[in-house]
């Protein structure tokens, strides 16, 4: 929805908590059975981190996090899709209707960045130098084979992080991974990406590359920087969590195992 501010919510239309309306104001709203998810659903059919609702700055995207049981959007299997007012999301015994209020006429207009897009990042695997170019609006990084970038590393969660664009800037968010995502050696839940940043997912490292002449965090052409998000985008506050208990693309595997990489890098005869 262009211009203005709008507040999305999920309303439970089937399952425990029927009729409840849950505001989703975060850049990344997580739904799953793991503590820390904004919407905590306790049921065997719900994965620990099952669904991400992602705000790009102009659209809301729903992304199934490579789950075994899956998620349905308007009764069709979901991978990544834009959700609109009235969209229906189904996972386990729950059904949610997306409610997106029209822009508030009193609210200030969103800032418009008149500079060219910083472009899509390419990730360079620092072990193999292999390049990965995300092709989806939300790129999944993790251990599960259904991830866009699948990493064979026991320290990597099934889905560890998601890569997407927020206000046309490349960002990455940790999705409650057991080993924290690191950017340039620092644990981060959410970060804007810059040229030559090093992303650490478990013991696997990627260097961020942007097209030549492009910078990922320059001020907008109107002299106002594009809105910046903080780690609060994914940090869960106890009072902000909703706990509900039930009554009852393209895939680029990181081919070389880390052990093989370590052996290849050892000097001959060692």
List PLM regions with ranges.
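Regulatory inter-domain linker segments that are low-complexity and enriched
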Residues: 1-8, 94-159, 164-168, 190, ...
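Short polybasic amphipathic segments
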Residues: 8-13, 69-71, 119-125, 179-183
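A generic structural motif
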Residues: 11-15, 54, 124-126, 164, ...
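Forkhead-associated
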Residues: 22-91, 133-203
């Amino acid at each position: 929805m262009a211009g203005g501010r709008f507040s999305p919510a999920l309303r439970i239309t089937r399952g425990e908590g029927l009729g409840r309306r849950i505001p989703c104001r975060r850049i990344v709203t997580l739904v799953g059975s793991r503590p820390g998810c904004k919407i905590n659903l306790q049921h065997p059919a719900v994965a620990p981190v099952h669904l991400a609702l992602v705000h790009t700055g102009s659209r809301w995207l729903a992304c199934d996090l490579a789950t075994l049981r899956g998620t349905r959007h308007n009764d069709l299997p979901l991978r990544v899709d834009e959700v609109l007012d009235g969209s229906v999301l189904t996972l386990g015994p729950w059904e949610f209707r997306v409610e997106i209020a029209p822009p508030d006429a009193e609210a200030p207009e969103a800032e418009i960045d008149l500079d060219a897009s910083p472009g899509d990042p390419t990730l360079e695997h620092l072990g193999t130098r292999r390049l990965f170019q995300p092709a989806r609006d939300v790129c999944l990084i993790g251990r599960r084979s259904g991830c866009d970038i699948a990493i064979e590393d026991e320290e990597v969660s099934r889905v560890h992080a998601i890569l997407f664009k927020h206000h046309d800037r490349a960002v990455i968010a940790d999705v409650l991974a057991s080993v924290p995502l690191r950017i340039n050696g620092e644990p981060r839940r959410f970060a804007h990406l810059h040229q030559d940043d090093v992303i650490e997912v478990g013991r696997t490292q990627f260097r961020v590359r942007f097209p030549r002449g492009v910078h990922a965090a320059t001020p907008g052409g109107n002299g106002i920087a594009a809105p910046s998000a903080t780690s609060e985008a994914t940090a869960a506050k106890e009072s902000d969590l909703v706990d509900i208990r039930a009554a009852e693309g393209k895939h680029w595997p990181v081919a070389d195992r880390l052990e093989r990489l370590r052996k290849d890098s050892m000097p001959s005869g060692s």
